[in-house]
Amino acid sequence: MSRDDLARLEEACVKAWDQHDADGFASLLTEDCVVIDDMEPKPLRSRDAARRYAESWFTAFPDMRVQEKNRVIGDDGMAVELELKGTNTGPLEMGGTRLAPTGRRITAGVNVFMKARGGRIREIHSHSDSLSMMSQLGLAGSSAPA
């Protein structure tokens, strides 16, 4: 894939998340994709598991917006810095635990690294500022303003 193709793939991924389009997100992935998220107990190892993962975030934060802050496109992958903003009004699936909605608003940074194969994303590594997110939700330490 060219760097322009990779850039378009990354843009489509961010757009799918911003528009809460779990099926659109899943369509960008290889069937055997792997999603590794710091807040998940183990890697997700299929397109369907990745779709369910996205749906869980859209349920937890139905007003969530995703904005790209920075990106780097390489020969076979992309790195993107994102900012997530939303209100936790639905149950949050995190680390194998289901957390009740807090009603609190968050602003959180997420760094995502993606590898591509054959025009689709084959691997995603997501690293979020989980301490800040949990604090803003009132679930860890002092609560920072959103």
For each of these PLM feature ranges, what is it?
Residues 1-146:
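C-terminal and inter-domain tail/linker signature
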